[in-house]
Amino acid sequence: MLAVKVYNTLTRKKEEFKPLVPGQISMYVCGPTVYNYIHIGNARSSIAFDTIRRYLEYKGYKVKYVSNFTDVDDKMINEAHAEETTVPKLAEKFINAFLEDTTALNIEPATLHPRATHEIKEIIAFIQTLIDKGYAYESHGDVYYRAKKFKHYGELSDQNIERLEEGASEHINDEEQNRKEDPIDFALWKAQKEPDEIAWDSPWGKGRPGWHIECSVMSTKYLGDTIDIHGGGQDLEFPHHENEIAQSEAKTGKKFVNYWLHNGFVTVGKDQEKMSKSLHNFVTVHDILKEVDPQVLRFFMASVQYRRQINYSAENLQQAATILDRFKNTLVNINYRLEDDTPSKDSDELAKAIAKTNEKFEVAMDDDFNVQNALTAIYDLLPIVNANANAEKADKKSLKLFKDKLSAWLLVFGIDTEKLCSQSAGSNDEIDQLVKKRDEARKKKDWATSDQIRDQLKEMGITIQDTPQGTRWTRD
């Protein structure tokens, strides 16, 4: 097995990936705060790390993949109030919506999807340990983490703690200043503000957990004190992931994560502005899937290396659709040839080209999941494959090999080739009957009828291809 290299945000360099347990990988990816439908930017993270997970599984690793639901925080409380519902009901609605959207995008379910509200007992115990060790303190019912006590604070995001402290002091209000020992300290537990606000009993009074502590608790509970891979968007690098490290390593005394991976943003418009709910420039997956084929959206998002930005536009979506169509039509072409009764001609040429492409694919993906180079290698093979499929005598053994390989390669990107082909060709009786009538007209040299049927099929979104092996059709 060739070694996979990943870019580790903590060390700012590519490193050879070595899991704690040979053949097994523990992986935690920060999930959504479930107060609304996910937008394309949220989906980018889910798709990026699903693609990484799929490739690691393709390599033979057994991956335990944990991704949480943040089902209580300020946004949840505010949205529940605005919708005149409860936080649990709001969470349930949008957890179900998230699962529907990710299923449509063929994102594999996590091994575990823990919810913060189901881990309150563990969160309270975790916080108490930090207090006992001197890393946290109670103040007016809140509990804060002493950031400066953790000597590695700021290393993940490459920030100086003194500068962080200066920045925090400029944005802190008088009430927070009175509660905190230091402006840079962050909340582990938040006291209940209103009698009807969702809260749990704790040694410090009624309240709820802070966002950062939730992920520390859930990741270590289900994956252990040290995790192989922790992923998330670049916007989570600070303060969220920085705080996770501080909390977790202070509690356990062990390295929290061996490899930190962060995906790039989705941008929109000519100015390539970051897509976010706070900027009100987002498009939800729920809405976009009403207009865009889920496989096209999935392929578009998966075909850009995870650390790079993606510019979301109709033009870029169309480009992805065109590439996907090329793969689709090649598979349809192969299927027709494999099903016809023409003799096969075995040859080493195509088999060798497939083996070389497989090598290029894996070399690219082993290099920090370079999906662009991997897809280029596959795409460059298509003319050779199609030429063989259209030859008088095709190498059917190698065509079958390519079909199987392409299915495995594209599955890494979340594309199911059987589903892809079912959208392109099939046993639609109406179309088959029209094609049959056209063939009969051609045999009689009734070109007017033949052309009329071709035009009729074109209006139905069907493209006709006349080959030595017979007439083939695909959906546009």
From Swiss-Prot:
Name of the molecule in the record: Cysteine--tRNA ligase
Gene: cysS
SMART domains cross-referenced by the UniProt entry: DALR_2 (SM00840)
Residues annotated to bind Zn(2+): 30, 215, 240, 244
Subcellular location: Cytoplasm
CDD domains from the UniProt entry: CysRS_core
Upper taxonomic lineage: Bacteria, Bacillati, Bacillota, Bacilli, Lactobacillales
Motif ('KMSKS' region): 274-278
Chain span(s) of sequence motif 'HIGH' region: 32-42
UniProt keyword annotations, A-Z: Aminoacyl-tRNA synthetase, ATP-binding, Cytoplasm, Ligase, Metal-binding, Nucleotide-binding, Protein biosynthesis, Zinc
Annotated binding of ATP, by residue: 277
PANTHER family membership: CYSTEINE--TRNA LIGASE, CYTOPLASMIC (PTHR10890:SF3), CYSTEINYL-TRNA SYNTHETASE (PTHR10890)
Broadest EC class assigned to this enzyme: ligase
Annotated GO biological process: cysteinyl-tRNA aminoacylation
GO molecular function, one term: ATP binding
The keyword Ligase appears for this protein: yes
GO cellular component, one term: cytosol
InterPro entries, alphabetized: Cys-tRNA-ligase, Cys-tRNA-synt_Ia_DALR, Cys-tRNA/MSH_ligase, CysS_C, Rossmann-like_a/b/a_fold, tRNA-synt_1_cat_dom, tRNAsynth_Ia_anticodon-bd
EC number: 6.1.1.16
Subunit structure: Monomer.
Catalyzed reactions per annotation: tRNA(Cys) + L-cysteine + ATP = L-cysteinyl-tRNA(Cys) + AMP + diphosphate
Membership in a protein family: Belongs to the class-I aminoacyl-tRNA synthetase family.
